[in-house]
Amino acid sequence: YIVALMTDLLEPAPGARLLEVGTGSGYQAAVLAELGLEVYTIEIVPELGEQAAARLKRLGYGTAATRVGDGYNGWPEGAPFDGIVVTAAAGHVPPPLIAQLKPGGRMVIPVGPAFMVQQLVLVTKAKDGTLRTRQLLPVRFVPLTGRH
């Protein structure tokens, strides 16, 4: 349910460039690639990232770009992104991700304290660069880890 909801909230158009923070098993990256999107996905846990990259390639989603690294910092070389989906809870919306979101883009991110109830937040960046945030529903995600 949550993968479908978060994907739908991005309102992705075919060919859109999307960043996923928190590759995990690679499931959401595969869903995004299946929709015809240009997918960049980053995972901080090396073993998970390497396994997901191999799995995506083996299943025919080799066009999804994968990287092991700290998702808080996003993927500057791939920016700007039409959409960003974050699958780990952050204490706040990371400024590097806001900077990498294209004007007119949307970000879906759980925000709140680790191991507590968080809020799923939709961040919309207007054409002039102003931000609008909307809390959507309570969720519980693993914490966004890394050095930030």
Annotate the PLM regions.
Residues 11-131:
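Conserved nucleotide-cofactor-binding alpha/beta core module
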Residues 36, 147-148:
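A short, highly charged, low-complexity intrinsically disordered segment
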Residues 132-141, 146:
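Conserved histidine-centered catalytic loops in small-molecule metabolism enzymes
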Residues 1-7, 11-12:
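Conserved SAM-binding loop and adjacent beta-strand
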